């Protein structure tokens, strides 16, 4: 019976040792789980902050693109109006030169009658 008692004591010691090892492994796993949950929370906060920042950047970008489009429209309209003014100025200059030429011809002395043959 002593042999059985010794075996039972040995089994009991091994069971206690295995239970202690399992408890240690569980505690280590709990520590790892807590670390990963902390990391998860930190990452979720970063994602939230980055998402908010991205939304602000997108809003600013949309406003700036709209402003740029307004600049483009204004510049295009101004350039078109300026080209019309330039064309009108060119036309006005041509008309003025032609009229000035006509006036010069109309007011010039008659060169045919005073060609110097009468002298």
From Swiss-Prot:
Note whether 4Fe-4S occurs among the keywords: no
Q: Per the record, GO CC terms?
A: axon; axoneme; centriole; centrosome; ciliary basal body; cytosol; midbody; motile cilium
List the coiled-coil residues.
13-70
Q: Which UniProt keywords apply?
A: Acetylation, Cell cycle, Cell division, Cell projection, Cilium, Coiled coil, Cytoplasm, Cytoskeleton, Flagellum, Neurogenesis, Nucleus
Q: Where in the cell is it found?
A: Nucleus; Cytoplasm, Cytoskeleton, Microtubule organizing center, Centrosome; Cytoplasm, Cytoskeleton, Microtubule organizing center, Centrosome, Centriole; Midbody
Q: What is its main location?
A: nucleus
What's the effect of swapping residue 30 to S?
A: Does not affect oligomer formation
Q: Summarize the impact of residue 18 to S.
A: Does not affect oligomer formation
In which tissues or organs does this protein occur?
Widely expressed.
Q: Give the residue ranges for region: Important for localization to the centrosome.
A: 2-32
**GO molecular function annotation:** identical protein binding; microtubule binding
Query: What are the N-acetylthreonine sites (modified residues) in this protein?
Result: 2
Name one process (GO BP) from the record: axon arborization
Q: Record keywords: Mitochondrion included?
A: no
Subunit-level organization = Self-associates to form fibrils. Also forms dimers as well as monomers. Interacts with SPAST.
Per the record, the similarity remark reads: Belongs to the SSNA1 family.
Give a short account of what the protein does.
Microtubule-binding protein which stabilizes dynamic microtubules by slowing growth and shrinkage at both plus and minus ends and serves as a sensor of microtubule damage, protecting microtubules from the microtubule-severing enzyme SPAST. Induces microtubule branching which is mediated by the formation of long SSNA1 fibrils which guide microtubule protofilaments to split apart from the mother microtubule and form daughter microtubules. Plays a role in axon outgrowth and branching. Required for cell division.
Protein name, as recorded = Microtubule nucleation factor SSNA1
Q: Which organism is it from?
A: Homo sapiens (Human)
